[in-house]
């Protein structure tokens, strides 16, 4: 769940919510009962869990060790590695940063070498570590687990824009992105 959803839930139960970090960091409750949150991370979340959740390769390895299905893929360091991995995995593929969240920098359903190299060149200017994986069509779900219990599941809907006949695409994207913060 997003920070906004957690805050709505707290307010629904008349719990005090204090913005202590420019809309990114909140305290819910007062005194010793108060809890801090940033996105879905709380003051109860262990540091190692946060580190794991931000590193897609470690997350994938841990899921694989538990015999959960993961997409075939690897970290790539240059165009030669990239093309070799794509041939081995098979198209379509996904390119994404190793570290990050909220789907930022993730490009899906890449179907050609030309598109792959173009996307890689774009990503390598923004991110140091890049992963290529096999693309599997289907829905994307986020699961929030608290105290070993699933408390929320959300379906991610890919971003899209509906024009208003007045603004250009860049203006519409900026408007939507600023509204999310």
Protein language model features and the residues they cover:
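Low-complexity, highly charged intrinsically disordered N-terminal segments
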Residues: 1-22, 41
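Short, ordered loop/turn segments at secondary-structure junctions
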Residues: 22-23, 98
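Short polybasic amphipathic segments
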Residues: 24-29
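Active-site nucleotide/adenylate-binding loops and adjacent lid/helix of ATP-dependent enzymes
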Residues: 35-181
């Amino acid at each position: 769940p997003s920070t906004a959803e957690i805050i709505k839930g707290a307010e629904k139960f008349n719990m005090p919510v204090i913005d202590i970090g420019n809309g990114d960091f909140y305290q819910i409750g007062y005194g010793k009962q108060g809890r801090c949150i940033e996105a879905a991370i709380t003051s109860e979340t262990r540091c190692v869990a946060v580190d794991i959740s931000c590193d897609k390769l470690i997350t994938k390895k841990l899921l694989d060790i538990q015999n959960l299905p993961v997409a075939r893929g690897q970290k790539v360091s240059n165009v030669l590695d990239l093309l070799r991995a794509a041939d081995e995995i098979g198209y379509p593929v996904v390119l994404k940063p190793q570290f990050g969240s909220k789907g930022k920098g993730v490009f899906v359903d890449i179907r050609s070498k030309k598109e792959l190299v173009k996307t890689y060149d774009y990503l390598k200017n923004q991110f140091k570590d890049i992963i290529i994986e096999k693309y599997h069509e289907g829905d994307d779900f986020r699961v929030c687990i608290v105290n070993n219990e699933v408390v929320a599941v959300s379906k991610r809907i890919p971003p899209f824009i509906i024009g208003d006949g007045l603004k250009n695409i860049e203006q519409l994207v900026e408007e939507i992105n600023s509204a999310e913060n």
